[in-house]
């Protein structure tokens, strides 16, 4: 058996990616951080993306924060997902930043959301806050693409939310809009404003928004794959 080390370059195939993800499964974040030489924070309050960075390092991800998928050559996106002891998601999952202007002619088929969700490597992580960060274990990976029903659900929510953005109602969108996907402000501070369209078609400044998958959606896909009780 080869020693467990981070991939130094992006994997060439899905099989290689999945194999590395399966080798990482069962290890704690502390073990993986030590082997990779990555300092481990006390908690995630100021380092929200730390787990993602650690897994990207181990799996040889290439994109960083660029708009293409994490494994651009294969078109695969990496998503870590904190779960409870029953394997149920503890929080919503960020997909991408929502475009608030320049949306003429954009369709679901050509949208950034669909591009990002076309092929996803889900990696569940123990998320119980009672477990110290270094002791939380990495779960078994799942390589997923939306089936017809999931694609339809995502499409309906995307169209509803984009219609509201285009018609100048972005400020009226709440986290309750959407069955499986929601639109929420995404900004570290409330001073980071971006341009959008107002109710009368005028330019306005508002908080950047992001698309997030709701827990009912990610919970169902994990349950189906891992045969969990919902």
Swiss-Prot record:
Keywords: Cytoplasm, DNA damage, DNA repair, Endonuclease, Hydrolase, Nuclease. InterPro entries: DNA_mismatch_repair_MutH, DNA_rep_MutH/RE_typeII_Sau3AI, DNA_rep_MutH/T2_RE_sf, Restrct_endonuc-II-like. One of its GO terms (molecular function) is endonuclease activity. CDD domains: MutH-like. Disulfide bonds: none annotated. GO terms for biological process: DNA modification; mismatch repair. It is found in: Cytoplasm. One of its GO terms (cellular component) is cytoplasm. Belongs to the MutH family. Sequence-specific endonuclease that cleaves unmethylated GATC sequences. It is involved in DNA mismatch repair. This is DNA mismatch repair protein MutH. It comes from Enterobacter sp. (strain 638).
